[in-house]
Design a protein with these regions (language model features):
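Segments forming oxygen-rich coordination pockets for charged ligands
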Residues: 1-110, 117-119, 141-144, 186-188, ...
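Short glycine-rich anion-binding loops that position phosphate/pyrophosphate groups of nucleotides
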Residues: 23, 151-154, 176-177, 256-258
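Adenosine-phosphate binding glycine-rich loop
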Residues: 174-242
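Conserved SAM-binding strand-loop segment of SAM-dependent methyltransferases
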Residues: 124-130
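Short, glycine/polar-rich helix-capping loops at beta-to-alpha or helix-loop-helix junctions
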Residues: 112-117, 155-158
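Short amphipathic alpha-helix with an adjacent loop that forms part of the alpha/beta core around
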Residues: 132-142
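ADP-ribose/adenylate-binding Rossmann-like module
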Residues: 106-108, 145-152, 161-186
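Short glycine/serine/threonine-rich phosphate/pyrophosphate-binding segments
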Residues: 91-94, 154-159, 179-182, 264
Length: 280
């Protein structure tokens, strides 16, 4: 199962699993994809189907109680993507801080002079193109953090309408109250719901009173970090992943709960191979 988990993580950056902790199905595991429980054992399909709706509501790594059954639900995340639309003055420090925070950073602008390595030396990817081409140029990625800082509400709405149709972890949009209002009205007129539009952080950033580009960038980064750390999730340890990919047999040890202070949190893992070597 872990090889499959790592494969999905490479594709989407996020995956959910569940393991039964008690009862007749103790030890059974499943992957949860698009709110459906996927088990390699067809005999347990009906069992998992009963809990699909409740599993879909789980957003963090923890033990959950569903009737008489206890589950350990894990949310794995990897390689958070920071995708910035607009290559102006605010975008430059946002990209720099994003890289410092461990994000893979992409910057897109429809002006070639605004997406250069001189302006964005820390970016991993620079894209010049129309914002209407967003879906063609940037693959959907669940562990994605989108920052819309284009120069006008037409660019904002072009980006937002495409992002709202795909999975994401964070979507923020810069702008005055009037600019944000115009964009919301346009998107509502196109059929997007109030619930969808309320998921957009607009105006973007925490209210720290910033005015200079670097100050605004700090407020944006702070809000992104706040959202990123809102739930307990399981991060992939590189040593554990390498061992699982290379070794044929072994045992995975997982912390499912803890009390008091500890350097390792819930979801932390250690892999032990058949020769007794430990990783993680």
């Amino acid at each position: 199962m872990y090889r499959k988990i790592y494969q999905i993580l490479e594709e989407t950056g996020k995956v959910k699993t569940a393991m039964v902790l008690n009862g007749n199905h103790k030890g059974e595991k499943c992957l949860i994809k698009e709110n459906h429980c996927l088990s390699s054992d067809e005999n347990t399909a009906d069992f998992w189907k009963k809990y699909e709706a409740d599993m879909a509501e789980c957003q963090e790594t923890k033990v959950v109680h569903m009737g008489d059954v206890d589950f350990f639900v894990e949310i794995y995340v990897k390689n958070p993507q920071l995708i910035i639309f607009g290559g102006g003055h605010v975008s430059q420090p946002v990209a720099k801080i994003g890289k410092m925070l461990g994000f893979h950073v992409t910057v897109m602008d429809d002006r070639e002079d605004f997406v250069t390595s001189e302006r964005f030396p820390d970016a991993d990817r620079l894209i010049k193109g129309s914002y209407d081409e967003l879906s063609d140029k940037i693959p959907a990625y669940e562990n994605a953090y989108y920052v819309i800082v284009t120069r006008g509400h037409l660019g904002d709405s072009a980006c937002a309408r495409q992002i709202l149709r795909r999975p994401y972890t964070y979507l923020g949009m810069i702008g005055s109250k009037n600019k944000v209002k115009l964009t919301r009205e346009k998107l509502l007129g196109e059929g997007f719901s109030e619930e969808q539009l309320n998921s957009i952080h607009a105006p973007i950033g925490l209210p720290i009173g910033g005015h200079m580009p670097a100050e605004i960038a700090v407020s944006i980064a702070a809000e992104i970090v706040q959202e990123k750390n809102r739930y307990d999730v399981s991060y992939i340890d590189g040593a554990v992943e390498d061992a699982v990919r290379k070794k044929e047999n072994g045992i995975m040890i997982t912390i499912i709960s803890k009390s008091g202070s500890s350097p390792r949190g819930t979801g932390s893992k250690m892999f032990i191979d058949k020769d007794g070597n430990s990783y993680g």
